[in-house]
């Protein structure tokens, strides 16, 4: 007889968290894993995260990425991730004020699904991620 729990586990959302600040990437991962999400992978290096995503792109439901990072910013990361998997949901995080016109200029085609403004509470992060996953 098939194990029903095993089938359910296969459909749990897999989340990629990317922030060059190790403590923040780890904190977001812990927040998500504490309540809802079991499959959360955190990265501090955009190039390493992109390589991992390239290999495992079919498994991911959502990417949460900081915008301002060295070597590759969040907008560049999103463009590359969308080339690999156009259906993955994208949340960007920033501590800076960014208006809709700037988003449209910098990221005209590959839209994002939401924005997390830092600092954000655990509750805010969970609410935003849960809402985007359900869409």
Predicted features by range, described:
Residues 76, 97-114, 123, 127:
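Alpha4 helix (beta4-alpha4-beta5 surface) of REC/receiver domains from two-component response regulators
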């Amino acid at each position: 007889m098939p194990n029903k729990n095993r089938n359910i586990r296969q459909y749990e959302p897999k989340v990629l968290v990317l922030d060059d600040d190790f403590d923040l990437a780890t904190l977001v991962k812990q927040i998500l894993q504490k309540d809802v999400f079991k499959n959360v992978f955190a990265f501090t290096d955009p190039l390493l995260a992109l390589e991992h995503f390239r290999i495992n792109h079919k498994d991911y439901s959502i990417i949460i990425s900081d915008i301002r990072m060295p070597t590759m910013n969040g907008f560049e990361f999103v463009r590359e991730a969308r080339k690999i998997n156009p259906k993955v949901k994208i949340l960007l995080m920033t501590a800076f004020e960014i208006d809709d016109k700037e988003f449209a200029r910098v990221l005209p085609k590959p839209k994002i699904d939401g924005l997390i403004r830092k600092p954000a509470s655990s509750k805010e992060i969970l609410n935003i991620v849960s809402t985007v996953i359900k869409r």
